[in-house]
Each structure stands twice: as C-alpha cells, then as structure tokens.
Amino acid sequence: MNEETGIPDDNLLTIEQAIANLQSEDLGLRVYAAWWLGRFRVNVPEAIDLLIAALADEADRTEAGGYPLRRNAARALGKLGDRRAVPALITSLECDDFYVREAVAQSLEMLGDNSCVPYLIELIKNPNPEASADTEPEHPYDAFLEALGTLGAVKAIPHILPFLDHPIPKVQYAAARAMYQLSEPMVADQYGDRLVAALANDDLQLRRTVLSDLGAIGYLSAAEAIGNTMAENSLKLISLKGLLEKQIVLATPPDLTDGAIRVMALMDDLL
C-alpha cells in the first residue's frame, strides 16, 4: 500500500516504479506501466502528465501502424477521471490508429466533458457509403455514438439517425442506444425495443453487445428478455444490474420501486 495515495501496489510494480517505467527507453515497460496506472487508478499529477504526453508518442509503433502505448494511455486517462486530459484526447481523435480513436472516444465518454461533442459529431457526419457488414469500418462508430449518447448530445440526433440502418449490427445497436438516451420519453421506447428484438440474434457476440447496451441505458422493459437471453448468466446479471441502478435512483428510501423488485427477482433466479 502506498501511504500517500492509499493505492495498493501489486507484486510486480509500485506506483513509483510504474511512473519511472513510463519514462523508460524500454517500450514494453512503458506500455505495461500505462496499463498499470489505469488499472490501479493512480490518479496523481505526475502520472496524469506522463500519460497525456504518451498520447503523442511516436516511438512505440507496430509494423501495421498501430500505437500500443497511445492506446493504453488513452484508456488509462479515462479511468483516472482528470479532465486536464480532455484537450489532448480530443487531438488524439485525429490519430490514424483505429484503436487509439476507439479508446479516446470511450475515455471522453467516461470523463463526461461536453467540449468533445463537436469533434465527435464531425467524425460521424460522412460515413463511408460503401461500408458493408463484411468490411472493417473506417472509424469506431459504435464508440463515437455511445459517447454522444452518454454526453447528452441532443444536437447530434440528425447525424445519429442514419446509423440505425448501418450494415454493421453493433453500430446499429450503438445508434439505438444513443437515440434512447437522447430522445424524449414518449419516443425513446422504440429504440429500447429495437435492442430487445436484437437479443434474438443468432450471433452470441452480438447478443453480448446488446446486453451491455441495455444495461447501459437501464431499459426496464427489457428485464425479462434479458433474463431469457441465450448468453452467460454473468453477463445477464451485469445487464440487469444496470437496470437496477436506474430504478434505485427513482426510489424513495427505504422503499424500492416495483421495477427494482422485479429486476432483483430476475437476478435471484440467475444466481
């Protein structure tokens, strides 16, 4: 345990060693240190500064053009919750590494700073018209859409709507998730119902994606469908936990809402 931060050290690194390793010439040590600092939520100024600097790293690049250190730094900065990282993360949305852009969007979503919204909207404005379910997307559109939904970017709605018909299913689901979050209650349910219908997909990985989306939006009408989905109980429980958390907010202690009681009964059945 580090006495100043209260953060537990693991058997391989201490906080001081991780910070030192992030400045090492050994690229492997730097990549691991960036991951470690995020994993253990080492929210100290020196770590934040070094991770921000790592977003511009040019030394660690794969033959395919990827930036492993930048990816880990971006992921860590989202977990650490310091909004000083937002400007550098926004700049990193221009990185030509798909997975850096994905990690950046996810971290901007976690940080909850709306200053990134105009940049995310620009990135979804002109999707490739020749995209198909069999080709890799040019951008991590699902991550962009999820961030816009979480950030309450209502002005992005006209640009999100076309993605409901995107050829890649998980992008469709991300669009439905965002539209549920951004729409008025009287129309939001149609997007939640789209996700419920997608739980019947033959592809297990896509069913897992939808479970995550339904948990994120806390769509109560999906509760029974989640419980009956052909997927791992652990994932169904995580999804139902998302629904339960939404219901807890609506409750007046010590009472629970009927929805919370309903979800808890379903969770008990899965344990």
Curated annotation (Swiss-Prot):
UniProt GO molecular function: lyase activity; oxidoreductase activity
Keywords, alphabetical: Antenna complex, Lyase, Phycobilisome
Origin superkingdom: Bacteria
Record EC number: 4.-.-.-
TM segment ranges: none
InterPro entries from the UniProt entry: ARM-like (IPR011989), ARM-type_fold (IPR016024), PBS_lyase_HEAT (IPR004155)
EC category: lyase
Signal peptide: none
UniProt entry tagged with the keyword Transmembrane helix: no
One Gene Ontology cellular component annotation held by this UniProt entry: phycobilisome
Pfam families from the UniProt entry: HEAT_2, HEAT_PBS
Family indicated by similarity: Belongs to the CpcE/RpcE/PecE family.
Its biological purpose: Required for the chromophorylation of the cpcA1 gene product.
Quaternary assembly: CpcE and CpcF associate to form a lyase.
Name of the featured protein: Phycocyanobilin lyase subunit alpha
